[in-house]
Amino acid sequence: MYRTYRKMKKVFFLFILILLGHLSAGPEETVKEFFQDFINEDILAINKNSDSPFIYIMGKNAVLEEKYSDAINFNGLKRDGWSYSKINTSKVLYDDDDTSMVQVNFSRLDKDNEIILTGDVTYLLVNKDGNWKLKGGFSPNLTTLGND
């Protein structure tokens, strides 16, 4: 009886591991996690949740960097008054097993919770080994990543 119990316990444990592997964040949740990492200025998490190279197209300007963290300058954003960002709306535009596009309307706010910028960005995500990663961002009206 004890042997049967141990076998059942192992099977249950394997089932849980497999289930957890399939419960990774979807594209929209990945973008929300990315925004939280951005607010926390967590460079390691930002790079973990984005793919390399990363491209950002803002109007007619294109930024191609090895890592997303190479494209962003938090000190520059803070000089412009940025304290944090928030997602106003998000919507999955396209989704298959390998790629996804998520449209986001967001605001940047200052320390007094005043909006200093509202923008739209569409993120391209790729599925790498079961994990969604940001590959690129496309924005008609995002003016700066803090590098001006």
Q: What kind of feature is each model-predicted range?
A:
Residues 42-57:
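Short, well-ordered alpha-helical segments enriched in acidic and aromatic residues
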Residues 116-148:
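Short beta-strand edge/turn micro-motifs at domain boundaries
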Residues 1-11:
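Positively charged n-region of N-terminal signal peptides that target proteins for export
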Residues 50, 60-61, 104-108, 121-123, ...:
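A mature extracytoplasmic/lumenal domain signature
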Residues 71-115:
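Surface-exposed, charged secondary-structure patches
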Residues 11-20:
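Sec-dependent N-terminal signal peptides
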